């Protein structure tokens, strides 16, 4: 479980592509490296990954992860290169404060950044997707973008876009400031909303079937 509060941004130290597998790694800062063990779960751009190897260094803890084909297909992991900056969050501990909203680290797909509007104290980013998961997105509802818990500021279902507002603090602590138009971001929809929408759709379908 994660909270959607990005704890660090890390630059990938290596990316290695193998048959049906992508391996990547980065140096986890000392502030986040306590109690990390092999098999630990860490969210990278919001996607839950398992630590497959680790080694101490002067800078911190070098950790390595594996991404199989399925993970690459539905996330922005397939675009990783050495030097790519990613959002990182350790899994939440019991009784930890949930500063954002509860996340599983299970990505439903990606959205494309279609526009950026900036002024002195705010940045609005608009994302687009024609994927089925867009039906779970609602104005003023939660959404996780690259692992960051955010509020949907605007939604245009006809254009298949949604917008988020970012304060300077969020831009400073995440990789959003490095995004450009056309970049893909990982999306996790809010789980309770997904359950409600799916339940309503199922009940309505059953009622229509009975009426026929």
Residue spans for each PLM region:
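Conserved loop->alpha-helix
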Residues: 1-212
């Amino acid at each position: 479980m994660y909270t959607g509060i990005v704890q660090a941004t890390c630059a990938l130290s290596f990316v290695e592509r193998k048959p049906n597998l992508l391996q990547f790694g980065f140096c986890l800062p000392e502030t986040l490296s306590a109690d990390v063990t092999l098999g630990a779960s860490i969210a990278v751009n919001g996607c839950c990954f398992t630590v497959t190897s680790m080694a101490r260094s002067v800078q911190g803890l070098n950790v390595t992860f594996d991404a199989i084909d399925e993970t690459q297909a539905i996330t922005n992991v397939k675009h990783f290169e050495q030097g790519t900056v990613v959002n990182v969050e350790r899994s939440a501990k019991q009784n930890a404060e949930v500063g954002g909203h509860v996340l599983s680290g299970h990505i439903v797909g990606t959205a494309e950044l279609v526009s950026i509007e900036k002024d002195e104290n705010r940045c609005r980013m608009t994302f687009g997707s024609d994927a089925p998961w867009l039906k779970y997105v609602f104005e003023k509802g939660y959404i996780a973008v690259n692992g960051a818990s955010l509020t949907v500021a605007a939604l245009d279902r006809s254009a298949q876009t949604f917008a988020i507002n970012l304060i300077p603090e969020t831009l400073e602590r995440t990789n959003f400031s490095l995004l450009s138009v056309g970049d893909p971001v990982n999306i996790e929809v809010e789980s309770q909303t997904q359950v409600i929408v799916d339940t309503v759709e199922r009940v309505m379908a059953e009622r229509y079937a009975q009426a026929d």
